[in-house]
């Protein structure tokens, strides 16, 4: 599962996917929260 946090801080993005860690920002400026 990948949650994007383009319009908000990564800290606000990650809780929607338990077990994620913040990755990015990518070249498109989006911070992704990836579920391992």
UniProtKB/Swiss-Prot annotation:
GO terms for cellular component: extracellular region. Expressed by the venom gland. InterPro entries: Toxin_16. The record marks 2, 30 as: Important for the neurotoxic activity. Disulfide bonds join 3-17, 10-22, 13-14, 16-33. GO terms for molecular function: potassium channel regulator activity; toxin activity. Keywords: Calcium-activated potassium channel impairing toxin, Disulfide bond, Ion channel impairing toxin, Knottin, Neurotoxin, Potassium channel impairing toxin, Secreted, Toxin. The keyword Secreted applies. It is found in: Secreted. SUPFAM superfamilies: omega toxin-like. The record marks 8-9, 13-14, 32 as: Critical for the neurotoxic activity. The presence of a 'disulfide through disulfide knot' structurally defines this protein as a knottin. Belongs to the neurotoxin 11 (kappa toxin) family. This is Lambda-hexatoxin-Hv1a.
